[in-house]
Every structure is written in structure tokens, then in C-alpha cells.
């Protein structure tokens, strides 16, 4: 089985909202340890995403085919800048973030050696060799980072290894892309002065900067300032699906020139040419995006960034246990095992080693 290190999941948010265990095979959500093992999912980026204050978690879908409805509703609230809620306070963001980080470490503690928090690419390699599920801490949006970056230093010591400057909402550092279709990602201004300093600080700490959710002006600011490879952990090709969340050819070319990486997002609304949230989207559409990304970037600069537990999956794949169906579809297109291993783990390891150090 081809092992897969995944560039994005929202499992820390989804687990309490679906009232399920990470260690038991479930019918809800997309990732638990049994389904991960069944599908060859060897680990990945565990995102801390802080919802807006006052949002109430609704019930999860009974068939487990999609995320809790709240996640779709969040996206609906962020379709236009004018209708977005006001930025959350630092105090709220930090309190919520601490809760998610604590949950992350509780998962590892409860795993009894079956899952492990990683802080380096070497840690991932050890987990792969030992059959241990690898988890690394990622922030999806920098709302919990103070203007002095003291919290960032603490979070880094606590294991933070990657960070998205924004989710699809503005904060003190920059501006995200509203969830619009069809739409260009070229909406709004670039990074603030504080956002530019955040880039420099992440470079100093060797924290990977995630460009997914960032608007195009902010993307180019990072490209100009950052000394690290450019990485979009969970985005697709705008030319195939003109969602604001996807990357233009010019952005893809910049990622290629930086020796960076794009992780394929499995969300059907970012895969389809019509942008519909239709679970009956065939796996072949995922393969179409991979074909295009590989042709544009090169086979060493493309990986997977599923958005499991935070998006609507193609029903034919459904959850982590369905990953072999994607692999089989790629084999049917002529992808050999060497290429599949690159897409599964090796390309992530390459860019993480370049960013974090060995």
C-alpha cells in the first residue's frame, strides 16, 4: 500500500462536533485511526482552526459523507468581505487555540504509541518506518499570534511547525479569499506590515508558511519576502476549477520556481469546473487536477492535502479508508509506484526538510 502524508485535515475541530473517538472506526467524519490504517494514511498536518465566536455546532451528517454542516455554513458566511463577521479578539483566539492544542496533545497521549507528535522530517521518517501515525501541529490562520510574536515563539516550542497567515477572512496580518465561484483570488490588499514581519519571523523559526486561503496580493508579498519554498497545502488548479481558493497558473509557476509544493485539495467545490458541492464527483476529476499540477510544476512538487473532516469529499472516495481508490485511479492513468510514492510522502518530506531542516 502506498503510504500518504496528508497536507491538511480539520479533525481537531470535527472530533468534538461529531462526538466520536479518533481510535475507533466510525461512520461519521473522514479520519479515525482505523480508517487511516485501512487507507494507508500515515499522518499529516492537524489544523487548528478557530471558528467565529458564538457559532453553535450543529449535528453531523448521518452518513459521514461530509463535514459537520457548520463547516459549510462557515464558508457561506465568508462569500463576500462586506458580510464577514468582525475580526476576533486576540484573547478569544488564544483561549480557543490553547483548547485545540491541548486536544492535539491529548490525542497523542491517548494513542499508547500508535500515534506520535512529530517536530521534524526525521520524526516523520521514523514514524513511517515503525508504522506509527505521525501528527504535526498546524495553525490555519494566525489570529492567535500577538503583534510582538511572543506567542509564536511559545507555540513553536510547543510543536507548531506550519502556519497559514490567514483563513478566508482578514486579520491583523493579511487578507484571505472569500469563498466565491467563479472568482479570481486577486481580491483585496496584500500583507500588512505586521504580516510581512510574520513572514520573516516564520523564516527565522523555520515554520512553514501555508499559502492556501491567502489572497493573491498576499501570495506575492510572501513570494517576495520568504526565503523558504512556497507551499500551498490544500489548493487546486484555478484553470480547471475557477474557485477563489484555487491557484492561477502564474502562482503555480512561482511555486515551481521556489522549489515548493502544492497539496491537492479533495473538496468537490474546488475540483469541479462548475464549483458545485456535489459528492457524486468522480475520482477522475481529482486525477485531472493532479495531471495538470504535475505538468505545470513537475512530479516532485505535487502532493496531497485532502481537507478531510473540513470539506465535502467525492462519495467514491468518502474518507481516509478510500485513499486506495484514488491510488488505483492514478495507476489506471499510468502513474508508476515511484511517482505514487512521491505524491504520497516523498514530496512532502523533501519540502519539509528544506523548510524545517533535516
Give the positions of each predicted feature.
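N-terminal hydrophobic targeting/anchoring segments and the immediately downstream early-domain regions
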Residues: 1-185, 242-304, 308-358
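Active-site core of metal-dependent hydrolases
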Residues: 165-175, 181-254, 263-268
